[in-house]
């Protein structure tokens, strides 16, 4: 099956004039006979960017929320207002309270900015599961990703409370898997579960060894140098053809990946399209 993945929301924009950037991520996954929206950004740029790129989101069959952070879910309400009710695939824990606490000095609420009841009232039809599942032809959600590597430790600045006492392990983090003739394509939100952990689960669950591409946020912009080193080693071992970094991959980690994988790494800014 063929897919076209277009980045609609990202921290940065590409060469297409008139598009807007914001801290967040959203990608439109188009396939024969339909389309799926993966994440929704913060809410300011999804609809304007889709319009600028001539993408009609009214025809989107469903929405996947990769996890319960504002910069991936904030555009859901504007989408529902503009395009009508949608089925929303998510982990049942996405509405948990979430905070970012940096240096024990400042606490920011970073959870979904709407309640579940409010979104249901706006037309969201939530389809919750924590399991690996098929949501369309050759399209799968990882569900909860087991943390098996020793070096992917998660973001130490994320908590379930304002005081920063209860770490948030982001168990709701999930990614989208597309099975293509070229191999697996992984669409990532933030990949809080770890890029290598997610790749290993994808291979195990689908039975496909070959990873053609990964696209989206990898959270490598928030990891230690040691974790980045180990991730580079693992990616090289998997022989991935395209590494398309967005959002929380960050500038420094993107520069490292571009150096380590010349011709294979691509900055996936707003407007970037991957066809497989």
Could you say what each language-model-derived stretch is?
Residues 10-12, 40-43, 68, 92-94, ...:
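Active-site metal-binding loops of divalent metal-dependent hydrolases
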Residues 53, 83-84, 122, 239, ...:
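Short, structured coil segments at secondary-structure junctions
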Residues 95-174, 237, 266-275:
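Metallo-beta-lactamase
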Residues 3-53, 169, 173-188:
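Conserved beta-strand hairpin/beta-sheet module of binuclear metal-dependent hydrolase folds
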């Amino acid at each position: 099956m063929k897919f076209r993945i277009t980045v609609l929301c990202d921290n940065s924009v590409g060469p297409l004039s008139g598009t807007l950037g914001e801290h967040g991520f959203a990608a439109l996954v188009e396939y024969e006979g339909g389309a799926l929206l993966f994440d929704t950004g913060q809410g300011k740029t999804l609809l304007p960017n889709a319009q600028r790129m001539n993408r009609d989101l009214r025809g989107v069959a469903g929405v996947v929320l990769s996890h319960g952070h504002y910069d991936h879910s904030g555009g859901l309400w504007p989408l529902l207002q503009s395009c009508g009710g949608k089925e929303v695939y998510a982990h049942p824990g996405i509405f948990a309270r979430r905070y970012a606490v940096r240096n024990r000095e400042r606490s920011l609420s970073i959870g979904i900015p709407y309640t579940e009841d409010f979104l249901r009232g706006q037309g969201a039809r939530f389809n919750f599961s924590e399991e690996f599942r098929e949501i369309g032809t050759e399209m799968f959600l990882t569900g909860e990703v087991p943390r098996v590597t020793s070096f992917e430790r998660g973001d130490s600045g994320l908590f379930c409370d304002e005081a920063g006492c209860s770490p948030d392990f982001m168990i709701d983090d999930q990614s989208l898997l597309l099975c293509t003739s070229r191999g697996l394509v992984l669409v990532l939100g933030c990949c809080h579960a770890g890029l290598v952990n997610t790749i290993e689960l994808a291979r195990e669950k689908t039975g496909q060894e070959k990873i053609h591409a990964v696209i989206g946020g990898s959270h490598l912009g928030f990891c230690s140098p040691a974790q980045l080193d180990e991730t580079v080693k693992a990616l090289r071992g998997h022989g991935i053809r395209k590494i398309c970094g967005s959002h929380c991959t960050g500038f420094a980690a993107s520069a490292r990946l571009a150096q380590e994988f010349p011709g294979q790494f691509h900055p996936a800014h707003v407007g970037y399209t991957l066809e497989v």
